[in-house]
């Protein structure tokens, strides 16, 4: 558990919830500042780096889930120039910028002075090339584990230990890559395990549940950073709106977290007693067990959102493949 519960940080994830509109993005940035979030986060993709040229020419033969995600990404496209404008707007109103780059080309934008931190999303948890390249930028690094099994987490621990030569501050997020997850998928107790696995790192919780109760309870189990999506309207079209928080909900999460941290700092309290104030039993609902499981929903989303190595073009037999060829 945390030694100081007053250090809880909050990340407002905009993601695709701007729907391709800079004006909506600015409203979300402003709201994030008004409710005292520490970071506002953007997702940046270069579809020419992520998708195979054949898919971009004609994706009608691909699986429906791939078609849906690709269409949503295209609808919510914002140019690099617009992102730079949004970075400057965030800096102007004094809220830190975090970026999730989905490819090496998008990572280049993270070199900007306006970008304070980088987050590696769950689909890229095992993308060691992206992680190592991000570490070289010497900025705080946040990594989500939503699609990872225990063995994957142990493997990435070795990668981080070997390659974090600049001693970049690292945060590991407990996460479930369902949008939204069922309560029995959330498994907040695994935050305890991550704190033991990574004693030198900060541990956080990246939530996609409806409402914010599990996010709030995550503090008890050792979360020092909480990330949630922010939306202007939960009924808006798009993949993340229905698992996002409104300004009012997010603000209440932050206010209530201060009450909980004050409670936990002043006295030790049993799990049963702590949960009883939320009318939850210790072994039910979102609490789970200290065992890492990847739900069927997360497995499905991993298949749709994660990457695989493919050739950029056809090569003659005997060609020695280099990184630039993939």
Across the structure, where does each feature detected by a protein language model lie?
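Catalytic cores and adjacent flexible loops of soluble metabolic enzymes
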Residues: 1-326
């Amino acid at each position: 558990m945390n030694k100081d519960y007053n250090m809880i940080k909050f990340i407002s994830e905009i993601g695709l919830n701007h729907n391709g509109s800079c004006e909506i993005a600015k409203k979300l940035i402003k709201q994030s500042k008004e409710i005292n979030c520490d970071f506002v986060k953007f997702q940046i993709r270069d579809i020419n780096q992520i998708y195979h040229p054949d898919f971009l020419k004609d994706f009608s033969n691909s699986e429906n889930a791939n078609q849906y995600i690709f269409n949503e990404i295209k609808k919510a496209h914002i140019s690099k120039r617009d992102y730079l404008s949004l970075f400057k707007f965030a800096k102007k109103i004094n809220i830190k910028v975090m970026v999730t780059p989905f490819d090496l080309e998008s990572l280049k934008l993270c070199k900007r002075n306006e970008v304070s931190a980088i987050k590696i999303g769950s689909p890229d948890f095992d993308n060691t090339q992206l992680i190592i390249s991000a570490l070289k930028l010497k900025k705080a690094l946040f990594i989500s584990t939503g699609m990872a099994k225990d063995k994957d987490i142990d493997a990435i621990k070795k990668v981080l230990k070997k390659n974090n030569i600049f001693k970049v501050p690292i945060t590991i997020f407990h996460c479930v890559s369902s949008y939204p997850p069922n309560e029995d998928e959330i498994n907040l107790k695994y935050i305890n395990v991550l704190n033991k696995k990574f004693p030198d790192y900060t541990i956080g919780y990246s939530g996609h549940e409806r409402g914010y109760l599990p996010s709030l309870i995550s503090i008890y189990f050792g979360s020092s950073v909480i990330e949630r999506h922010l939306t202007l309207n939960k009924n808006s079209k798009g993949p993340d709106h229905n698992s996002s928080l409104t300004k009012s909900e997010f603000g209440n999460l932050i206010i209530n977290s201060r009450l909980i941290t004050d409670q936990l700092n002043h006295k030790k309290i049993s799990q049963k007693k702590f949960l009883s104030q939320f009318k939850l039993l210790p072994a039910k609902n979102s609490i789970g067990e200290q065992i890492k499981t990847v739900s069927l929903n997360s497995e499905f989303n991993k298949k749709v959102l994660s990457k695989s190595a493919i050739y950029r073009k056809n090569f003659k037999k005997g060609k020695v493949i280099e990184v630039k060829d993939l």
